[in-house]
Amino acid sequence: DLAFTWQTGPLVASVVDVVESRGIRTAILDVSFTCHMPDCLEMPYQPRVRNAESLPAEAVKTATREDHVYRLGGNSCLSGDYMGSWKFDHELQVGERIVFEDMIHYTMVKTNMFNGIHHPSIALLHAGGELEVYRTFHYEDYRDRMC
């Protein structure tokens, strides 16, 4: 049997902090490229982010503050848990949602719980706006994978 999917659903993240080092602004998210989107680091593949323009990775090094260009960083302790450059039409704020389009098929198949990183819940957003949560992950899921 052959199966493939496309536009399976987004991975929704939140900005937990914005840091700047050597002129590079990084929005730290509550998801991890290493744990939730490893294909992005392995291929490399830069996912489409809703309401943002994908730029070459080097663009973040030359952007001005007014350009609203950010590197997006994951929440693991791995130093390479970040990706590329995205240009937004505004300054990102803590708590703001970042939507990675068409990522659920990568997120669910290749995911890992490196250092106990929390997994995103699996949910279905119905046409009428109702959010139905199918699965929420907890510490016990991490513990049981290790034992």
Kindly give the residue locations of the regions a language model identified.
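Charged (often Lys/Glu-rich) extended helix/loop segments that serve as interaction or gating elements
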Residues: 1-147
